[in-house]
Design a protein with these regions (language model features):
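Low-complexity basic/metal-binding stretches
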Residues: 1-4, 169
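A short beta-strand/loop micro-motif in the catalytic core of glycosyltransferases
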Residues: 126-127, 147
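A conserved active-site-flanking secondary-structure segment within enzyme catalytic domains
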Residues: 142-170
Length: 170
């Protein structure tokens, strides 16, 4: 938490109530094996909020097959950097041991590493859903961050990010 530069209110990261008329861009990192619910749940919720959010889907390839076998297309290439004020959502995958061992996951992990400086500078916010926290941990994004994940991968999260403050049963 910090104070908003415009209104002085305490805010998480970069968003504040003074920017209610702003459209916030939300970027969903979309990899092969993405959990359908982890992607569509947050996306649908934000879509229902109206024009306050612009949803973008990014990843190493333009089309992936998700956990339900459905093909998701229209995925944009990974941008060099996220614009200031963005929200990055890293959804989980159906089997992180398999899905995060792919060339696409390696490319996404490298891209996430390149975003670390901007994340530390709080120019964008990071939200991980379920095992998406493991990918962020592998990219070094969770050092000194209070975090949790699905109980099946919490041990791997703690191993991938020993400096993260991983918590169980949250």
């Amino acid at each position: 938490w910090r104070n908003c530069l415009r209104c002085g209110a305490p805010v998480a990261g970069i968003w504040c109530s003074a920017g209610q008329n702003m459209t916030h861009t939300v970027w969903f990192l979309t990899l092969p094996g993405v959990m359908a619910l982890d992607l569509t749940g947050p996306a649908e919720t934000l879509q229902l909020a109206g024009d306050r959010f612009s949803l973008r889907y990014i990843g190493p390839q333009p089309e992936v097959v998700c956990s339900t076998g459905m093909t998701i297309g229209g995925i944009e290439p990974l941008p060099e950097q996220l614009p200031a004020g963005s929200l990055l959502v890293v959804p989980g995958v159906y089997d992180s041991q398999i899905c995060y061992a792919t060339p696409q996951a390696a490319e996404a992990r490298d891209w996430l590493r390149r975003q670390n400086a901007a994340l530390c500078a709080q120019t964008f916010m990071l939200v991980c859903v379920c095992s998406g926290a493991l990918l962020a941990a592998q990219a070094g994004m969770l050092d000194d961050v209070l975090c949790t994940t699905h109980h099946d991968v919490i041990t791997r999260l703690k191993a991938a990010a020993p400096r993260a403050r991983g918590q169980e049963n949250r």
